[in-house]
Amino acid sequence: MASQLTDAFARKFYYLRLSITDVCNFRCTYCLPDGYKPSGVTNKGFLTVDEIRRVTRAFASLGTEKVRLTGGEPSLRRDFTDIIAAVRENDAIRQIAVTTNGYRLERDVANWRDAGLTGINVSVDSLDARQFHAITGQDKFNQVMAGIDAAFEAGFEKVKVNTVLMRDVNHHQLDTFLNWIQHRPIQLRFIELMETGEGSELFRKHHISGQVLRDELLRRGWIHQLRQRSDGPAQVFCHPDYAGEIGLIMPYEKDFCTTCNRLRVSSIGKLHLCLFGEGGVNLRDLLEDDIQQQALEARISAALREKKQTHFLHQNNTGITQNLSYIGG
């Protein structure tokens, strides 16, 4: 199905990132170093299963093929498995993925797969247990690793692992990561540290361009792969001697926004056209009843006409994003 979600720059949007909570139990240095602080929204204030069913149905009707459930930590919701099943009800949604810190992966991943989950991204910023603890504030490295193993045992053929690239923290550990994925079908995605409203000092101290890793990968014979239309923003590299892949997400690179194919809805029902945009368009008043779907689709389509051509990170403008738990990164 061709996407009806096309902006003024002829970009088509097949991919929805849907945040279902901003609560997280980790305290990652680059996101929530002081831990989660409620913003006035209680658990009852987040989108309900019925609201999630309606918003994903509207996006699917407009051509969305992939939904990624994000947070916060989405698995902290007690109804998380029900949420997966609600999204799965729509046959037009071909891929349902989650980005998780892995805290509940070992316990619940088989149930998530049975409910319809097709993809998993796990955040792992270091393969050293002590450094993992220092970055996340949680001594859960072995638990997260066991969760990744459990995902393969549950039938997932590939697991994606997100690693925030930080100077003097993990940027020099490429060989360790490559050894880890040599015999494992893991797509390891290095994500450039991004500046947020609360993270400017950390950014100045630890940002390093992903170009450094790309040059090294190409030097070692890694091959750049072509993107599919519902893929995320990663540049993916493969090597004949490795079961795993490497992905690089470099938001500061020239023309990064040219291939944008994703929209975001926050855990309180606001449509965000860009991770680093302003404001957001309220959808929640149109999520109360199934009969509102046509009006909901019209509002989404109208909002898309206002999407900017690019973010303004190069001008140190991080928009409304104070931290990455706010609308799910």
From Swiss-Prot:
Residues 8-234 form the Radical SAM core domain. Pfam families: Fer4_12 (PF13353), Mob_synth_C (PF06463), Radical_SAM (PF04055). It comes from Escherichia coli O127:H6 (strain E2348/69 / EPEC). Its EC number is 4.1.99.22. It catalyses: GTP + AH2 + S-adenosyl-L-methionine = (8S)-3',8-cyclo-7,8-dihydroguanosine 5'-triphosphate + 5'-deoxyadenosine + L-methionine + A + H(+). GO terms for biological process: Mo-molybdopterin cofactor biosynthetic process. Pathway: Cofactor biosynthesis; molybdopterin biosynthesis. [4Fe-4S] cluster 2 binds at residues 257, 260, 274. Its cofactor is [4Fe-4S] cluster. This is GTP 3',8-cyclase. The lineage of its organism: Bacteria, Pseudomonadati, Pseudomonadota, Gammaproteobacteria, Enterobacterales. Signal peptide: none annotated. NCBIfam families: moaA.
